[in-house]
Curated annotation (Swiss-Prot):
Full protein name: Phenol-soluble modulin alpha 3 peptide
Domain of life: Bacteria
Modified-residue entries (N-formylmethionine), positions: 1
The species this protein was found in: Staphylococcus aureus (strain MW2)
Expression triggers: Up-regulated by agr.
Keywords, sorted A to Z: Cytolysis, Formylation, Virulence
The protein's role, per its UniProt record: Peptide which can recruit, activate and subsequently lyse human neutrophils, thus eliminating the main cellular defense against infection. Stimulates the secretion of the chemotactic factor interleukin-8 (IL-8). Showed the most pronounced pro-inflammatory and cytolytic activities in the host, thus contributing greatly to virulence and possibly to the development of disease.
Coiled-coil residue windows: none
NCBIfam families recorded: PSM_alpha_3 (NF033426)
InterPro entries: PSM_alpha, PSM_alpha_peptides
Length: 22
């Protein structure tokens, strides 16, 4: 399940970057 946790964090950080830029 470590892969899922990393994948979730990746999308979370990516989404945060998009929302933070706007």
């Amino acid at each position: 399940m470590e892969f899922v946790a990393k994948l979730f964090k990746f999308f979370k950080d990516l989404l945060g970057k998009f929302l933070g830029n706007n």
